[in-house]
């Protein structure tokens, strides 16, 4: 849930029997800190995930987890992984989860899969960066758990860090309107699911290929994610969050636009 939405439209269930997990890279996102404070006031247990400690978030949350960040960080020690592990632990403690041990092992194994995938993906990533570097609009696509990474790529990388107009399209929503923008020059980036929603991605992909040859499909199943069996689809977001970094660094270099460049963010109050 968006932090500022939580502040202004707080779910009525929030109270002493609730755990609220918030996250901020620098720990100073005002809306996130405020949401944490609101949860505290309502009696909830609050857990803050942040890379920077001390920070306003670490000072506000009742419990703090400092996660790892960067190309050398271990996948299971990253922000999204900690959020996932917290949900997993709560589920197992409250209701029991028959695949708990398997999930813990799969999450630990994911790091090795990601490390190898980041090496294997380089040739395709270089080709993609040079082909897409001059596009003024790029649409990301995904479904199921992969919609999250596709959304993050659109708003945090293309729009925030590269100043490329972008929008995320859920593969299941593609035929409810968005498919009308498809032509031979439309730029698409799909993060394909290996799980239950893969048919949604395939349906959209089949249509796009009839009218377009500028869609790049990043498919985790080609890079070892299936070694995790039926649990793979739960862990795909962490896979894509890491592997897509190879693409992001390369397109930033190709466009001569560093990922750290900002016009407005952190420049003045807003």
Annotate each predicted stretch with a short phrase:
Residues 210, 221-260:
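Structured C-terminal subdomain patch of bacterial secreted/periplasmic proteins
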Residues 71, 88-169, 175, 263-270:
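Active-site phosphate/pyrophosphate-binding segments
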């Amino acid at each position: 849930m968006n932090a500022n939405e939580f502040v202004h439209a707080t779910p009525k269930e929030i109270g002493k029997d609730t755990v609220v997990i918030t996250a901020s890279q620098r720990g100073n996102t005002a809306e996130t800190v405020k949401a944490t404070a609101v949860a505290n006031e309502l009696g909830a247990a609050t857990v803050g995930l942040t890379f920077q400690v001390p920070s306003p978030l670490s000072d506000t949350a009742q419990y703090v987890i400092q996660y790892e960040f960067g190309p050398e960080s271990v996948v299971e020690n990253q922000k999204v992984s900690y959020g996932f592990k917290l949900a997993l632990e709560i589920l197992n403690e409250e209701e029991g989860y028959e695949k708990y041990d398997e999930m813990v092992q799969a999450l630990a194994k994911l790091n090795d899969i990601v490390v190898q995938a980041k090496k294997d993906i380089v040739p395709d990533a270089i080709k993609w960066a040079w082909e897409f570097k001059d596009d003024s609009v790029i649409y990301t696509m995904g479904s199921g758990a992969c919609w999250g990474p596709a959304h993050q790529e659109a708003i945090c990388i293309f729009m925030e860090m590269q100043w490329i107009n972008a929008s995320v399209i859920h593969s299941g929503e593609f035929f409810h309107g968005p498919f009308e923008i498809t032509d031979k020059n439309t730029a698409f980036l799909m993060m394909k699911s290996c799980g239950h929603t893969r048919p949604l991605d395939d349906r959209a992909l089949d249509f796009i290929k009839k009218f377009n040859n500028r869609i790049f499909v990043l498919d985790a199943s080609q890079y070892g994610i299936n070694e995790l069996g039926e649990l793979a689809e739960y862990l795909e977001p962490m896979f894509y969050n890491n592997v897509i970094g190879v693409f992001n660094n390369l397109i930033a270099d190709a466009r001569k636009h560093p990922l750290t460049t900002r016009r407005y963010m952190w420049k003045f109050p807003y």
